[in-house]
Design a protein with these regions (language model features):
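Alpha/beta enzyme core
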Residues: 74, 99, 115-286, 294-315
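An N-cap/entry alpha-helix motif that binds or orients negatively charged groups
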Residues: 1-47, 152-213, 349-353, 357-360
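Alpha/beta catalytic cores of nucleotide-metabolism and tRNA/nucleoside-modifying enzymes
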Residues: 1-23, 266-286, 291-360
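N-terminal capping/small domains of soluble enzymes
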Residues: 1-140, 332-334, 351, 357-360
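Glycine- and other small-residue-rich loops at beta-strand/loop junctions that grip anionic moieties
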Residues: 7, 61, 65, 85-86, ...
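A generic, residue-level signal for flexible/boundary positions that often mark functional hotspots
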Residues: 29, 36-38, 43, 58, ...
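General structural signal for secondary-structure boundaries
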Residues: 91-94, 214-216, 347
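Short, contiguous strand/loop micro-motifs
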Residues: 58-60, 80, 107-108, 204-205, ...
Length: 360
């Protein structure tokens, strides 16, 4: 399970770069500014958040803890931030809507089955989701070699190798046995992808990705939804402009956590050019490589409106369920507040590129 969370595609160059790239930027403090009161609040897609980072969509959280996505949504709500549910979640979007009254997004794909895509839109409206987040960097699944090496399957299969690993982690294994239900909750009513033993979950998901999706399809989905709409997976200024032109509310600057095309730039390196291209007309969210509060600070100083975290909270979920996720959010918040004070900035709204410089 650890390698599924921790790994990336091919040689994992992009995976490593996502975090390492933050070291290329120096924060430029301005002292003798009052920082006795630190304000981390922001407004994103019309919703007030207590912190400028939120939960990114990650699939199949049941793999990592039996409390699955529900625990993560509760942790996000407790910290006053937004939660994003993946289409490939093991909790349904209706379940999550009942868990929290906080801001919620649903991550969606434009699938080969357009009726299923439209059905997701209708269900999100009925469940009062605040925004849609369309992932566009998955015309097919990336080549995640670590999963092949470790023999990763979803749900986990009982092999000699896996049984040995389960024996070394009795608490996780015990909870798996007590809570064996594993299903793609948002599509279970249409097709049980796990019932067909001749097709793995990865193969099923890959079969649903549509390589014909175009900007016209994005414009169609934006009209179908008619609300705050984020496009996830863009990395260039030109694509940011296209997103603006088709009516998106924001862009999530992301390379899928280094799990799709290996060799792409780190999201932090794309912020400045994308902000220059769209001005203040789009909300920009940075997704990828966030491990420290100072990483959040750097992304915001470069022009991002918010950041999203994925791997970081999954480590917490796997280790301790809801409490583990809460601890990760608390650690990041404390580091961010400390970083703001040491930078000489009392409010997120006061951050600008004068506080950051790329090392030559």
């Amino acid at each position: 399970m650890f390698h599924y969370i921790d790994g990336g595609a091919d040689d994992e160059v992009t995976l490593r770069r996502n975090t390492a790239a933050y070291e290329d930027y120096d924060l430029q403090p301005s002292f003798l500014n009052p920082v006795d009161k630190i304000d981390t609040r922001i407004n994103l897609f019309g919703k007030n958040l207590d912190i400028p980072f939120f939960i990114a969509p990650t699939g199949m959280s049941r793999l990592f803890h039996h409390t699955k996505e529900n625990a993560v949504a509760r942790a996000a709500d407790k910290h006053g931030t937004a939660y994003t549910l993946s289409t490939l979640g093991t909790a349904s979007l209706e379940e999550i809507a009942k868990e929290t009254d906080g801001p919620k997004m649903f991550q969606i794909y434009i699938l080969k089955n357009r009726e299923l895509t439209k059905e997701f839109v209708s269900r999100c409206k009925d469940a009062n989701y605040d925004a849609l987040c369309l992932t566009v960097d998955t015309p097919m699944a990336g080549n995640r070699e670590r999963d092949k090496i470790t023999g990763m399957t979803m749900p986990p299969r009982f092999t000699f190798k896996s049984l040995l690993s389960f024996a070394l982690h009795p608490s996780w294994s015990f909870n798996l046995l007590l809570h064996p239900d594993f299903r793609l909750a948002n599509v279970a009513h249409r097709v049980d992808a796990l019932a067909n033993s001749t097709m793995s979950l990865i193969e099923y998901v890959n079969s649903q990705f549509d390589r014909t999706v175009s900007w016209d399809d994005v414009a169609w989905l934006i009209q179908e939804w008619n609300g705050p709409f984020i496009i996830k997976g863009l990395l260039t200024a030109d694509d940011a402009k296209r997103a603006k032109d088709v009516g998106a509310s924001g862009v999530m600057i992301s390379n899928h956590g280094g799990r799709q095309l290996d060799g792409t730039p780190a999201p932090i390196d794309c912020i400045a050019s994308m902000r220059e291209a769209v001005g203040n007309d789009l909300e920009l969210i940075v997704d990828g490589g966030i491990r420290r509060g100072t990483h959040i600070l750097k992304a915001l100083a470069l022009g991002a409106d918010a950041v999203s975290i994925g791997k970081a909270y999954l480590y917490g979920l796997g280790a301790g369920g809801q409490k583990g996720v809460e601890l990760v959010l608390e650690m990041l918040r404390n580091e961010l507040e400390r970083g703001m004070a040491l930078l000489g900035v009392s409010s997120i709204s006061k951050l600008s590129n004068k506080y950051i410089q790329k090392r030559l």
